[in-house]
Each structure stands twice: as structure tokens, then as C-alpha cells.
Amino acid sequence: MSSELQATIEAMLRPGCGLLAADESAPTIAKRFKAVGVESTEEARRAYRSLLLATPGLGDHISGVILFEETLGQKADDGTPLAQVAAKQGIVPGIKVDAGKIALAHAPGDEITQGLDGLAKRFALYKTQGARFAKWRAVYNVSATLPGWLAMQANADSLARYAAICQEQGIVPIVEPEVLMDGDNDIERCAQVTEAVLGEVFHALRRHAVVLEHMVLKPN
């Protein structure tokens, strides 16, 4: 399993290349389509992402692409699964697996990310569809009092549990603890929260025996 994870990491981290986030949810991509007068149907989304992934030379600059679950199951006009369209260009297919955020109970203003239930079984399907890495995003609202320790600990534990499940299934995890930058706090407060959040995340990763060499950290 470690050799599989190492091969994926090396492919994702090709020098001079980056990761493309193409994992917009249906509501998000609907807003973008509406701005250019396009109705957001499943066929329109399939055609758009097919065009994107088949762009000649894309693999010269992009080493991995994060896909939405819908996209992973779609095919190009010639019947080729879109994950394979990406792979043929040397682009590693990945998938966003979290189910979004909700309010954290007994923690006003804080949020927690959902999606751990049944994750291992979902990975079994995603791997057959070509996914080799995954992404999970935790969101931290910032103010003079936020995030609270409960939110930092709960989200860190969820990120670590997700990462451990990923590695157990041969999937490289992208761990994304996003400290939001749209509040009215100053940069010093943002730095303070970021340090605390990353500390909690890496303590949790260690508790869950996540191999750091086989994961990617995506900070804000």
C-alpha cells in the first residue's frame, strides 16, 4: 500500500505543475454557468468538464485534478471516463469527499465538516472509477473569540480520521484546514488562529497514525 501511495504522491508533485480544483458543487457551478447564460444541466456540466480535461497540453502544467463526485462517473463524447481522459494526459484524478459544513452543536459561530459515514465503502467505488487521491476541507471562522477549542479539536479529529481512512484504502489525502480570511480581524489574529489550528491538526494526524509523507497539506 505504501508503494501505491508513494507513486501517487510523486505523480501529484511533478516539478513545475500544480493541482487543478474542478470540484465545484452543483449549486456553485450553476452560479458560474448562469453568469454566462448557460443552464446548469448534467449534460452541460459533463460537456464543460470534458472540454476542460481534454485541453491539449493540460498535463504539461497540471499534475492532478480534484473532481466532484458527479464528474468521476461521467464520460467524454467517445465513451472514455473523464478520469481516464485526465490520466491520459498524465494528470492524477482525485475527488472531493466531504459533505459540506454544518453548525457545530454547543459552539455558536463554529462549524464542523460532515461526510465520514460510509467513507471507506465510497472509496472502494471511487478507486474503481480512477480516483487516486481525495480532498477534505474543514472551515474555521475567525473573530476575537472564534474558533473555539471544541471546533479546532473536532475538525482536527475529522481531518485525521478522513486521512487515515484514505491511506488505509490506498488513497492519498489532501488535508485542508481552511482558516477563513474574510472576517474583520487583523493579520496577527489570523496568524494566531492558523498556528493553533495547524497544531491541533498535526497532533490529531499523529494520534491516528497518518503517514505525513503520504499526504498533502492544503493550508489557506
Residue locations for each model-derived region?
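Catalytic alpha/beta core domains of metabolic enzymes, predominantly
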Residues: H208-N220
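Conserved, mostly hydrophobic/aromatic
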Residues: L20, T41, W136, V175, ...
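Proline-centered loop/turn at the N-terminus of a beta-strand
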Residues: V92, V172, H214-V216
